[in-house]
Amino acid sequence: MDQFAHISAHDAHQKLAAGAARLVDIRDPQSFETAHAVGAFHLTNGTLVRFMNEVDFDTPVIVMCYHGNSSQGAAQYLLQQGYDEVYSLDGGFEAWRREFPIQAGDA
């Protein structure tokens, strides 16, 4: 995959439920702590190395932001770091929260 792909909240949820991907949330710490998708990894400059050490490069990664815009740059960056399959979640957290479970606090 040379470029990230777009994925709907529904398709992302199916991949995650099947254990076929990891979800990362790139929103600011306060927004993440207030509410985030269940099981999301809070990806920041400070947690990037840990994520890369924990998640194999052949594991599909789904990137979530607020509305689906910022996630595109982050998705492309993860591809450049060596991840094979990266998706930007269309509609971001706002699309996710309309359909699927969210939680508060640190994940």
Curated annotation (Swiss-Prot):
Subcellular location: Cytoplasm
UniProt-listed Gene3D superfamilies: Rhodanese-like domain
Limits of the Rhodanese domain: 17-101
Catalyzed chemical reaction(s): thiosulfate + hydrogen cyanide = thiocyanate + sulfite + 2 H(+); thiosulfate + [thioredoxin]-dithiol = [thioredoxin]-disulfide + hydrogen sulfide + sulfite + 2 H(+)
EC number: 2.8.1.1
UniProt-listed Pfam families: Rhodanese (PF00581)
Record's GO cellular component terms: cytoplasm
Residues annotated as the enzyme's active site: C65 (cysteine persulfide intermediate)
A biological-process GO annotation: glycerol metabolic process
GO molecular function term, any single one: thiosulfate-cyanide sulfurtransferase activity
InterPro entries membership: GlpE_sulfurtransferase, Rhodanese-like_dom, Rhodanese-like_dom_sf, Thiosulf_sulfurTrfase
UniProt keywords, alphabetically: Cytoplasm, Transferase
Family, per entry: Belongs to the GlpE family.
Chain's role: Transferase that catalyzes the transfer of sulfur from thiosulfate to thiophilic acceptors such as cyanide or dithiols. May function in a CysM-independent thiosulfate assimilation pathway by catalyzing the conversion of thiosulfate to sulfite, which can then be used for L-cysteine biosynthesis.
Name the record gives this protein: Thiosulfate sulfurtransferase GlpE
Origin species: Aeromonas hydrophila subsp. hydrophila (strain ATCC 7966 / DSM 30187 / BCRC 13018 / CCUG 14551 / JCM 1027 / KCTC 2358 / NCIMB 9240 / NCTC 8049)
